[in-house]
């Protein structure tokens, strides 16, 4: 086993600048509101939403690590990312602080993973992150292109990572006796991959799941959800009511006592943690042998981009990477609320802003959400239907990551989405869907604009399998 890499001071400063939050002195992890700075008490069993939410602030909770007390494990013999990187999870620090042994926590994760395998055919393993030289010619670049392939993950996408991290936390607080009464149902609003992932993981945990879907949800997705035992509610749009109707129904269910089992950080900030394993895996693959200059991430609700950015930032702070790559995001021409918000925040900054100026603009934006983020005004349509969220719920963290790293929000049209999907499938042999390859459309745009150097390394994530 290789020794863990110790943190470097400059990398720790990078994380402090990028996320501007403090950690709890009791645990090596804490849950902090990115909007108002409220630190959630460690005794709270469901640290999902800020208690001060309800005003115009963007009260999305973030899990924050005290990297001075942690190390990044580089052992390659452990295939399960939730075991390998357990020391970076809030649920682990909560469990061990209350007397659960390391082995007991590992056994819990392995037992839950075995249940996932029972339901879906296989459990969680580190997914491939490799160079894809066959992409260079179609993109007309000499840069090194890397692909993180999530199409073979549980339920066919990255979404199950978010859900499994939540399930582990829920089982920890149950075993520790931090809750009483009946186990509340779980709830999610989704049109596809997120719902399927939630249903698989909920079934593995033997928990009731409420799923709110749009009227155009695919029949084969609904059939699979029913097989998995999910309780489905179809949600039509209501005349004169802005926003996603499935999200409105989700909020109503949460108000009635359901627990948010979602990828949206605004409803459950702890959902981001499981997705951070993507960033850890990418960093571990590059440790000691490579660098990453750009990462291009497709965005719907924003949980994927938020998780990858934070996972890479923590990896840099722990000395695995020499620094953060530029974080770029991709949305469709059908709906681009994140790009709109980015431009509004950037409009408050000078041409070459320093970290403190970025932090000030982000603090203002987080306190005045309605000035920067609101539902898309028209009903969006795209081949990449999985990223057509009316709002980017985790927008503040993602805008901050782009501003701090020099990344850009990209908007791609339907032709670019279709072409990128064709290129991605042909060049890599990966059966990725148009949503899952939308990041490649953004990378192609950056290459055409001459923004990817010939000696640079850029990564995309193929996040959803063709069904």
PLM feature spans:
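Positively charged, low-complexity intrinsically disordered leader regions
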Residues: 91-179
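Active-site/ligand-binding-proximal alpha/beta "capping" segment
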Residues: 249-318, 419-422
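Catalytic phosphate/nucleotide-handling subdomain of diverse soluble enzymes
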Residues: 440-467
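Active-site/ligand-binding loops adjacent to catalytic centers
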Residues: 237-263, 314-431
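Short glycine/serine/threonine-rich phosphate/pyrophosphate-binding segments
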Residues: 160-166, 187-205, 218-222, 272, ...
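Active-site-proximal loop->helix
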Residues: 182-185, 194-240, 244-253, 339-343
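A short, small-residue-rich loop immediately preceding and capping a beta-strand
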Residues: 176-201, 205-214, 291-301, 327, ...
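N-terminal juxtadomain amphipathic helix
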Residues: 23, 29-111
């Amino acid at each position: 086993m290789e020794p863990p890499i110790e943190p470097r001071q400059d990398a720790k400063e990078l994380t402090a600048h990028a996320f501007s939050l403090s950690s709890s002195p009791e645990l090596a992890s804490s849950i902090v509101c990115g909007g108002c700075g409220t630190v959630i008490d460690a005794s709270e069993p469901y640290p999902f939403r800020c208690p001060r939410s309800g005003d115009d602030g963007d009260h999305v909770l973030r899990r924050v690590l005290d990297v001075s007390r942690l190390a990044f494990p580089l052992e390659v013999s452990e295939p399960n990312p939730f075991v390998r990187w357990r020391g970076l999870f809030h649920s682990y620090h909560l469990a061990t602080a209350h007397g659960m042994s390391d082995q007991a926590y590992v056994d819990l994760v392995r037992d839950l993973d075995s249940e996932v395998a029972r339901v879906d055919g296989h459990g969680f393993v580190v997914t491939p992150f490799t160079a894809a030289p066959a992409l260079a010619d179609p993109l007309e670049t000499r840069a090194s292109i890397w692909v993180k392939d999530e199409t073979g993950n549980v339920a066919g996408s990255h979404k199950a990572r978010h859900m499994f991290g939540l399930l582990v936390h829920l089982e920890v607080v149950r075993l520790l006796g931090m809750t009483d009464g009946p186990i509340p149902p779980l709830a999610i609003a989704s049109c596809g991959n997120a719902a399927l992932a939630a249903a698989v993981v909920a079934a593995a945990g033997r928990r009731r799941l409420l799923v709110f879907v749009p009227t155009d949800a695919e029949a084969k997705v609904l059939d699979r959800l029913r097989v998995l035992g999910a309780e489905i509610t179809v949600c039509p749009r209501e005349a004169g009511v802005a926003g996603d109707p499935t999200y409105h129904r989700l909020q109503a269910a949460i108000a009635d006592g359901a627990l948010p089992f979602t990828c949206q950080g605004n409803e459950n900030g702890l959902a981001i943690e499981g997705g951070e394993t993507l960033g850890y895996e990418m960093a571990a693959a590059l440790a000691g042998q490579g660098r990453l200059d750009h990462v291009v991430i497709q965005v719907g609700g924003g949980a994927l981009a938020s998780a990858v950015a934070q996972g890479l930032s923590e990896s840099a702070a722990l000395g695995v990477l020499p620094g953060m790559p530029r974080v770029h995001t991709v949305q469709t021409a059908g709906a681009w609320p994140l790009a709109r918000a980015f431009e509004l925040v950037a409009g408050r900054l000078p041409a070459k802003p320093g970290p403190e100026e970025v932090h000030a603009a982000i603090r203002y934006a987080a306190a005045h959400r309605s000035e920067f983020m609101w539902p898309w005004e028209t009903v969006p349509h795209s081949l990449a239907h999985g990223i057509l969220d009316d709002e980017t719920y985790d927008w503040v963290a993602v805008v901050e990551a782009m501003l701090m790293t020099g990344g850009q929000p990209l908007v791609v049209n339907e032709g670019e989405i279709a072409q990128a999907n064709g290129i991605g499938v042909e060049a890599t042999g990966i059966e990725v869907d148009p949503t899952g390859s939308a990041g490649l459309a953004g990378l192609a745009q950056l290459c055409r604009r001459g923004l990817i150097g010939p000696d640079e390394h850029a990564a995309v994530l193929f996040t959803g399998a063709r069904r």
